[in-house]
């Protein structure tokens, strides 16, 4: 029972950290490459 409580308290923290870092990474990518729909190396 104690292991289940430990898992239930660790999983939301890890999920929050993961999605927070993923959101930060996506924000920084969109800041560096603002128009990601048309990359310059795709236009021939």
UniProtKB/Swiss-Prot annotation:
Record keywords: Chloroplast, Membrane, Photosynthesis, Photosystem I, Plastid, Thylakoid, Transmembrane, Transmembrane helix
Any single GO CC term annotated in Swiss-Prot or TrEMBL for this entry: chloroplast thylakoid membrane
GO biological process, one term: photosynthesis
InterPro entries given in the database record: PSI_PsaJ (IPR002615), PSI_PsaJ_sf (IPR036062)
UniProt membrane topology term: Single-pass membrane protein
Chief site of localization: plastid
Keyword Translocase set for record: no
Ranges annotated as spanning the membrane: 7-27
Protein origin, superkingdom: Eukaryota
Gene3D superfamilies on file: Single helix bin
Protein's cellular compartments: Plastid, Chloroplast thylakoid membrane
Keyword presence, Transmembrane helix: yes
Purpose: May help in the organization of the PsaE and PsaF subunits.
Family: Belongs to the PsaJ family.
PANTHER family cross-referenced by the UniProt entry: PHOTOSYSTEM I REACTION CENTER SUBUNIT IX, PTHR36082
Name of the featured protein: Photosystem I reaction center subunit IX
Organism the protein comes from: Drimys granadensis
Lineage of source species: Eukaryota, Viridiplantae, Streptophyta, Embryophyta, Tracheophyta
């Amino acid at each position: 029972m104690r292991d289940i409580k430990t898992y239930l308290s660790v999983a939301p923290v890890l999920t929050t950290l993961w999605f927070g870092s993923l959101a930060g990474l996506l924000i920084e990518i969109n800041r560096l490459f603002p128009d990601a729909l048309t990359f310059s190396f795709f236009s021939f």
